[in-house]
A protein has these predicted regions:
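N-terminal active-site segment of His-dependent metallophosphoesterases
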Residues: 1-58
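Active-site-proximal beta-strand elements of phosphoester/diester hydrolases
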Residues: 2-11, 100-112, 143-145, 197-204, ...
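Divalent metal-coordination and catalytic microenvironments
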Residues: 9, 28, 37, 42, ...
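Active-site environment of divalent metal-dependent phosphoester hydrolases
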Residues: 12-16, 45-50, 74-81, 111-116, ...
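Binuclear metal-dependent phosphoesterase catalytic core
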Residues: 18-19, 23, 171-175, 190-241
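Charged helix-capping and loop-helix junction motifs
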Residues: 19-22, 51-56, 88-89, 124-127, ...
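His/acidic metal-ligating clusters that form di-metal
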Residues: 27-36, 67, 118-200, 234-235
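Glycine/small-residue-rich loop that forms an oxyanion/phosphate-binding "nest" at active or ligand-binding sites
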Residues: 69-70, 78-94
Length: 241
């Protein structure tokens, strides 16, 4: 059975962050069943011009013969990402068919409209929501890929760094009977189900978060998610690096 490897929250900024990403890419390349990579946001930290081209060159050095899709996170510059990945091996798209399943990519990198959400929170903007509604009307049991969790999960401080319009998006998913969401942002492997929607969060490659600790923290626990797209549902296994 073919599989997908999800790589998230690389926070590329220094040599150590690239070394950790290398471990993830080598794991994906050596996984014989994997033919697709999902890069689920926070790829670069405070990105500047050419940073995504550097990531592209790094990925092409370690990954061959695999389809690669990317979305932006709150640390990314979505416009710069699209420009620097254009016509490359990393695809920034709104939807795709992967292993016979419809996959919808949702951009949550917009900043919240209110001032109550702390730095790191996100929002799906009005244009994105309108497009997502159109996609859902024409999709059959799609898989949704987004950076921020739609279902709040983890420690209280992580739940605060949330998606501003998460409640309305969850209601939309439930209305259209979407069963599976793939996300990042939480730097840990967490799975939760609410209103019939199961959300699968991947660990980061940069550093981990221990959600049992009541304040912001970092750990050395990094990894990727290995995802099986089955006929009706998906199955996720975490590979710790």
């Amino acid at each position: 059975m073919r599989t997908v490897i999800q790589i998230s929250d690389c926070h590329l900024s220094d040599e150590s962050s690239f070394n950790r990403l290398r471990k993830a890419l080598n794991t994906a390349q050596n996984e014989t069943t994997c033919d697709t990579l999902l890069l689920t946001g926070d790829l670069c930290c405070n990105p500047r011009a050419s940073d995504y081209q550097t990531l592209l060159a790094f990925l092409n050095k370690h990954i061959q013969n695999k389809h690669v899709y990317a979305i932006a996170g709150n640390h990314d510059d979505f416009i710069l990402m699209k420009e620097e990945f254009r016509d490359s091996s990393i695809h920034v798209v709104e939807k795709a068919e992967i292993h016979g399943r419809q996959v919808l990519f949702l951009d949550s990198s917009a900043k919240p409209l209110d001032e109550h959400h702390p730095l790191g929170s996100g929002r799906v903007d009005n244009r994105g929501v309108a497009r997502f509604k159109r996609q859902l009307r024409h999709a059959t049991n799609p898989i949704v890929v987004v950076h921020h969790p739609i279902i709040p999960v983890g420690s209280d401080w992580m739940k605060a760094i949330c998606l501003e319009n998460d409640a309305s998006l969850l209601a939309l998913l439930a209305k259209h009977r979407v069963q599976d969401v793939i996300c990042g942002h939480g730097h840990d492997a967490l799975t939760v189900t609410k209103q019939g929607v199961t959300q699968h969060m991947a660990p980061a490659t940069a550093y981990g978060f221990d959600h049992n600790i009541d304040e912001y923290n970092r750990s050395e626990k990094i990894g990727v998610n290995k995802i099986f797209f089955e006929d009706e549902r998906i199955k996720v296994e975490t590979i710790w690096l």
